[in-house]
Amino acid sequence: MVMELHNHTPFSIYFITSILFIFFVFFKLVQRSDSKTSSTCKLPPGPRTLPLIGNIHQIVGSLPVHYYLKNLADKYGPLMHLKLGEVSNIIVTSPEMAQEIMKTHDLNFSDRPDFVLSRIVSYNGSGIVFSQHGDYWRQLRKICTVELLTAKRVQSFRSIREEEVAELVKKIAATASEEGGSIFNLTQSIYSMTFGIAARAAFGKKSRYQQVFISNMHKQLMLLGGFSVADLYPSSRVFQMMGATGKLEKVHRVTDRVLQDIIDEHKNRNRSSEEREAVEDLVDVLLKFQKESEFRLTDDNIKAVIQDIFIGGGETSSSVVEWGMSELIRNPRVMEEAQAEVRRVYDSKGYVDETELHQLIYLKSIIKETMRLHPPVPLLVPRVSRERCQINGYEIPSKTRIIINAWAIGRNPKYWGETESFKPERFLNSSIDFRGTDFEFIPFGAGRRICPGITFAIPNIELPLAQLLYHFDWKLPNKMKNEELDMTESNGITLRRQNDLCLIPITRLP
């Protein structure tokens, strides 16, 4: 150590001293700022902060972020203040506090933070998910609920869903027919199937651009996962140019070109009125608002909405199907009951379609229980306060980010007995639903910013699960026991398995 110190030049010693002095001054300013804030504003409780990083060190590790946030909330309460970098965040982990945010004060918390990475992929916040609350958002949401994602429109995609799921069943059957019982990667095939449904619903027939688009959407989601340094230090120009920004822009340029080609193809296609009515896809619907409406969408607006639909209808649906099958493998009693129900309903037909899905009451309970334990988006898309307000006796300053931990709320022991156990029966004689009125169960959010694509997502979950249970029995490879199945979660925007779900399918003989 002495040798190293002597080897420093006067310039380097001066430089180090200057850095230490700047750090000391900054530390004092942070202390003064924090003490001033705490003396004038009664924030919710939270752990002590460190200079520069705040509480970042307490949510970084080998586990997904929602675990750390729940553990901290167990100590500091369901309305908790965290300083992440230079940004104040309020973490919500109880149904009561979620109701305050998404119902009582819903309008005040209806804006989105201006995240650097989401700004890139959402075309400056022009999609339904990341746009700010206002006239544009209201018009866009109206298009989604009245035109784009109505029950009638979603039902018109029934043949697409049935064809894509039939292709999946065919692939599995081919594997099951191989000698010795071959292993099938269910994760990859489910992901491909749900995105295939979303692609055909959005673009019409199978597009030559489809695989490139799906691949790039997956890359975008990976780069969007977690906290961006630029969003933790929004005042720093240096951080704005660092991190995943360059990588994301590169991937997004490819996605943008593909979407523009698809839009141009739709514009140039001449259709008769009869053909348009028969096969109208989501791009067709959105393009009508470039011609026949006072509220005109640009090409970039359309691209942003299509991406939102892909994430809601493809990524989240595949996550629920994947976790549903994982839980069924780990709980053979539930698997047997679910298979018995599906086979009882469909055996007279000999095949599964959507006409009788409403009769699968136990399967619907399985889906709800899956979303309780594994919500597709564990930390709901953050909100930001528009004005200063008071919640539960605490002050929430304006421009404060709000993070709602839906994963933790689904494990709240006050509302759920045996929180870690997979028990679909808890929903059988219960009116609790996922449409935003029961705040102990909010996998799709609630209030003004609830996911508008629920009607699009649910059939993409019910039909595949029913088919997988009807046609096949399932077992783990390498003589693994059911309880040995790894259930580790990956870190990211959506809740996925860390390791792919690989099973041995056994074709069921009628």
UniProtKB/Swiss-Prot annotation:
This protein's UniProt keywords: Heme, Iron, Metal-binding, Monooxygenase, Oxidoreductase
Broad enzyme group: oxidoreductase
CDD domains: CYP71-like
SUPFAM superfamilies membership: Cytochrome P450
Domain of life: Eukaryota
Pfam families recorded: p450
Cofactor needs: heme
EC number, as in UniProt: 1.14.-.-
GO terms for MF: heme binding; iron ion binding; monooxygenase activity; oxidoreductase activity, acting on paired donors, with incorporation or reduction of molecular oxygen
Binding site for heme: 451
Similarity annotation: Belongs to the cytochrome P450 family.
Name of the protein described by the UniProt record: Cytochrome P450 71D10
Source species: Glycine max
